[in-house]
From Swiss-Prot:
Organism encoding this protein: Saccharomyces cerevisiae (strain ATCC 204508 / S288c) (Baker's yeast)
Carbohydrate attachment residues: 118
Main subcellular localisation: membrane
Cytoplasmic compartment segments: 24-64, 145-230
Name of the protein this chain belongs to: putative uncharacterized membrane protein YNL228W
Amino acid sequence: MVWCHYILLVLTFFLFTTFFTAACPAIFTWLNSLFRLSNDSPHVVHTSIAEVGDIEDGRVDKDGVLFVDLEFFLGCLPFFFFALVDQSSSSSVCKPLSPSDAKRSSNSLLRLSLVSSNDSDSSVSVSTFAFFFFFLFFLFFVFTCTFSSELTSSTSISISMLRLSSSLSSSEDDSASFLSISASSACNACRSISSFSLTLSSAESNFSRSERLSNPSVMFSSSISFRISSIFFLCSLVFMWFFNCFSDLNVLLQIKHS
């Protein structure tokens, strides 16, 4: 049963990673054709399709494009599904609920009862679900602030993206621009690693002490699962970072030859 759980995790990981790796370049090219920086203001992004230059035959317009690490953001989504599968699979090996615990846990929507003890800590909060919806909201907020002319000047994330895109369009040294893109991707990777590590530690610490003492196999299974998820997450972040670097270098070459 434990091996089936791990096989399911690995298959889920490769499924979503393959899908987003194949889909993100097309989405990224489409976004580049819709959004670009304005000539008169470095902090304003025009979202009107009539004001935007097109990318034709692999050539980028000389005014520059707005660079967004869409591959990185969408590439992080598989690991939240991965954590959801891990959380639900780990809970399947727990003991059944008593009627009193089932009645007490039915009043909460985002809590999953794990043990049949009588103390108030017998149910664990599924923080992975809450963090997943928070991540989706964060994505919506970032893209809204980035592509809105009213909020761009007051948002640090959007300003950093605009500076990065400005360096793409105005820099004459390809190596300097490539290093700046790599540094930005590395910073985004570090932020995602830290937030995901906090999620894992929070979910793991939510297991009640009574369950850890009464059923050590549950603690061992969940601990191994969380660590395997972390290892896959870190390895895939490294892969996505190199993928972004080569993709960004391709964009730089297109801008240079346009």
